[in-house]
C-alpha cells in the first residue's frame, strides 16, 4: 500500500488561525511528495482565486477542489464545475432575500457577488475570502456560472437557519456549516468528496490511497470517503466521528506532522 493523494482543508486545518502556514517546511515536504508520486490537493469552501494566492510557486502544479467541490481545477485546467440552473438560482435568491438575518454572497466561476448595501465589516471579511468580488445592487441578470452561496450570520442563529433552509430550499441546495458565522449552500452531491472523486478517477487513485484532513462540517463527506482521514484537534464532534484518525492543532502544524509520517512510511502508513 502506498499513499498517492493528500488533500487538505484550509481554514482551521492547513492554515493557522492567523491564516498562515510554515511555507519552508511544506515546500520541502512538497518536493518529497513529488519524488514519491504523491498528488497534493487543496479542498476548501473558499474561492479558487483566493486559494491559489496561498501557493504562488506551485498553483499550476497542484489541484484545487474549490467552493466546497463546486469547481475542481488540476494544473490550471478545469476538471469539473457544478452549475445551478437560472431558475434554481432565482428561487434560492428569492428565499434568501426574505431572511434579513443573513448576508448573501453568490459564488460564480468568474467572480463572487454581494450587495452594495451591506456594511463595511461584512465587506472586509468577504474580501478576505473572495479575491474576485463584485458589489451589485441586486442579484438579477448576473451572467456567470453559479455553484454555491456563502451566507454570513450570527453563530447562535445557524442551527435554526439551517433547519429553515432545509425546509424551504432543501430540494435545490444543501446547507453546510463551514465555520464561525458562515453557512454554504451547495448543490446536492457537489461536495468536497465528489471533487476528490473526480480527481481520483482522472489519476486512477483508490480511496485506500488517499489521506485527507479537515475540521468542519463541510469536510465530513471526504473524511468518510478517504482511506486515511484525520480530524484536527480543533474539530467538532461530528467531524471527529467521521474521521478514522486525529491530527494535532492547526496552530501547531498538525497537518505537516502527519505528512512527515506519510513520507517516512510511519504508522499508520506502514502497512
Curated annotation (Swiss-Prot):
Ranges that cross the membrane: none
Binding residues for phosphate: 10, 44-45, 192, 218
Family annotation (Pfam families): Hydrolase_3
GO BP field: riboflavin biosynthetic process
Phenotype of gene-disrupted mutants: Cells lacking this gene can grow in the absence of exogenous riboflavin; this may be due to the presence of the functionally redundant protein YigB.
Needed cofactors: Mg(2+); Mn(2+); Co(2+); Zn(2+)
Keyword Cell cycle: no
Entry's Gene Ontology cellular component terms: cytosol
Catalytic activity of the protein: 5-amino-6-(5-phospho-D-ribitylamino)uracil + H2O = 5-amino-6-(D-ribitylamino)uracil + phosphate
Domain of life from the UniProt record: Bacteria
Binding residues annotated for Mg(2+), in chain numbering: 9, 11, 215
Broadest EC class assigned to this enzyme: hydrolase
UniProt xrefs under InterPro entries: Cof, HAD-like_sf, HAD-SF_hydro_IIB, HAD_sf
Keyword Phosphoprotein: no
pH dependence, record text: Optimum pH is 6-7.5.
Cofactor details (free text): Magnesium. Can also use other divalent metal cations as manganese, cobalt or zinc.
EC number per UniProt: 3.1.3.104
Gene Ontology MF term list: 5-amino-6-(5-phosphoribitylamino)uracil phosphatase activity; magnesium ion binding; phosphatase activity
Coiled-coil ranges (or none): none
Active site positions: 9 (nucleophile)
Protein's pathway: Cofactor biosynthesis; riboflavin biosynthesis; 5-amino-6-(D-ribitylamino)uracil from GTP: step 4/4
Recorded family membership: Belongs to the HAD-like hydrolase superfamily. Cof family.
Function recorded in the entry: Catalyzes the dephosphorylation of 5-amino-6-(5-phospho-D-ribitylamino)uracil, and thus could be involved in the riboflavin biosynthesis pathway. Is also able to dephosphorylate flavin mononucleotide (FMN), erythrose 4-phosphate and other phosphoric acid esters.
Protein name: 5-amino-6-(5-phospho-D-ribitylamino)uracil phosphatase YbjI
Annotated organism of origin: Escherichia coli (strain K12)
Amino acid at each position: 500500500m502506498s499513499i498517492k493523494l493528500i488533500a487538505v482543508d484550509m481554514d482551521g486545518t492547513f492554515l493557522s488561525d492567523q491564516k498562515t502556514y510554515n511555507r519552508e517546511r511544506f515546500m520541502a515536504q512538497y518536493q518529497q511528495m513529488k519524488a514519491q508520486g504523491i498528488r497534493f490537493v487543496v479542498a476548501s469552501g473558499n474561492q479558487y482565486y483566493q486559494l491559489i494566492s496561498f501557493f504562488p510557486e506551485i498553483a499550476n502544479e497542484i489541484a484545487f477542489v474549490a467552493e466546497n467541490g463546486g469547481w475542481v481545477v488540476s494544473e490550471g485546467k478545469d476538471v469539473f464545475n457544478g452549475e445551478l440552473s437560472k431558475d434554481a438560482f432565482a428561487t434560492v435568491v428569492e428565499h434568501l432575500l426574505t431572511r434579513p438575518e443573513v448576508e448573501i454572497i453568490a459564488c460564480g466561476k468568474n467572480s463572487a457577488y454581494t450587495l452594495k448595501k451591506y456594511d463595511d465589516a461584512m465587506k472586509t471579511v468577504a474580501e478576505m475570502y473572495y479575491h474576485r468580488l463584485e458589489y451589485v445592487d441586486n442579484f438579477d441578470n448576473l451572467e456567470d456560472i453559479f455553484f454555491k452561496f456563502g451566507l454570513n450570520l450570527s453563530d447562535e442563529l445557524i442551527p435554526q437557519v439551517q433547519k429553515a433552509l432545509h425546509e424551504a430550499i432543501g430540494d435545490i441546495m444543501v446547507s453546510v456549516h463551514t465555520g464561525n458565522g458562515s453557512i454554504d449552500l451547495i448543490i446536492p452531491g457537489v461536495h468536497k468528496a465528489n471533487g476528490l472523486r473526480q480527481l481520483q478517477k482522472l489519476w486512477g487513485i483508490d480511496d485506500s490511497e488517499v489521506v485527507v484532513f479537515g475540521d468542519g462540517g463541510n469536510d465530513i463527506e471526504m473524511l468518510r470517503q478517504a482511506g486515511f482521514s484525520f480530524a484536527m484537534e480543533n474539530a467538532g464532534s461530528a467531524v471527529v466521528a467521521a474521521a478514522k484518525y486525529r491530527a494535532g492543532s492547526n496552530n501547531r502544524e498538525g497537518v505537516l506532522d502527519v505528512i512527515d509520517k506519510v513520507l517516512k512510511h510511519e504508522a499508520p502508513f506502514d502497512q
